[in-house]
Amino acid sequence: CTILWHVDDLKISLVDETVLEKIARKLDKKYGTKDAPLTVNRGSVHEYLGMTIDYTTKGAVQFRMTDFIDGLLEEAAEDMRGTANSPAYHHLFKVNPNAKRLDEKKADYFHHMTAKLLYLCKRTRADIMTAVAFLTTRVSAPDEDDYKKLARCIKYLRATKDLTLTLEFNDSGTLEWWVDAAFAVHKDMKSHTGAVLTMGKGGVFAISRKQKINTTSSTTAELVGVSDALPLVIWTRKFLEAQGFKVTDNIVYQDNQSAMLLEQNGKRSSGKNTRHLDIRYFYCTDQINGDEKTMSVHYCPTGEMLGDFMTKPLQGSQFKKFRALILNIKPDQPATSPKSDRPEECVETRTV
């Protein structure tokens, strides 16, 4: 039995429906009252934490947050009207030192909207995650240039508000992580880590974040990127195995072969340009070569590297190609996607 628990909102799933009913009755007996019984929803379509989760299609689950996006767009300022083909300009990471700082009211609005975008991208819209990752680094002192980048992301959402995330799992038992890093792209010359997890079709999880330390080469940036993702790489395998899922391989794909050698061989492949690295970044060597062998590292050409989507503001056909793979949609799919024709099945609803 799997229970997702967020404050007082629970999502429970199990093959045996009788056990689900038993759990619901016990929870109602423990926490429900005559005047305020628990609310129970059953069926193929559920509303949970602002998401619509649709299990209508066999072998797939679709996530959408159209209502959340509609509310966000209603809050958009007048100068954020219009649409855009991508969530970020190609110069996303460039900071203009001469740009005027936003006044307090506008800065608060910038922070508010960025927080909403962060909530959205971490649940269903990973296609805006790179843009949002940069915006979150600017909330403490945003300027007019940052505001324009926020507006660009809002305009893209307006053009694509009905896009959904659909996950389809295969039976290979293979977890595939696509990990990449963009070297020294931030104002302080720090690099940017990107990662995507797939278990069939669609991105189950994604990372796009500024690295916490400076590195001296693209190789060391890639190594730090893997270190950033490694806790999740290991935890995901252990979590799935605890759920009874047989994991046959836990693959980390990279496009930097020098970094791969360091990860596979540890200090034996370390030259004068990498000796300064803390030993913790070779923890992955133990995961690859140790007794448990919790992961393996494979090469992936840059043109096929999904993690690249999370490290830089891609444009045009490459952006659409990776977006389609991560959201599991067609590359030429229109921005307005039809919702499920099947109405929500709700066997029982009790209001608090």
What feature does the model see in each segment?
Residues C1-G32, I53-R64, T137-E144, A259-N273:
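Catalytic palm subdomain of template-directed nucleic-acid polymerases
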Residues C1-K26, K30-T39, L120-A131, F205, ...:
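Active-site palm subdomain of RNA-directed nucleic acid polymerases
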Residues D8, L27, G50, I69, ...:
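Mobile genetic element proteins and their domesticated derivatives, centered on retroelements
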Residues L10-K11, A181-M189, Q257-L262:
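Short acidic, Gly/Ser-rich segments with clustered Asp/Glu that frequently serve as metal-coordination loops
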Residues R42-D162, P301, T311:
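C-terminal reverse transcriptase regions that engage the nucleic-acid substrate
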Residues R138, T174, K212-V352:
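RNase H-like nuclease module associated with reverse transcription
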Residues K155-A181, F245-K246:
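Structured nucleic-acid-interacting core domains from mobile-element enzymes and related host factors
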Residues T174-A221:
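RNase H-like nuclease fold core
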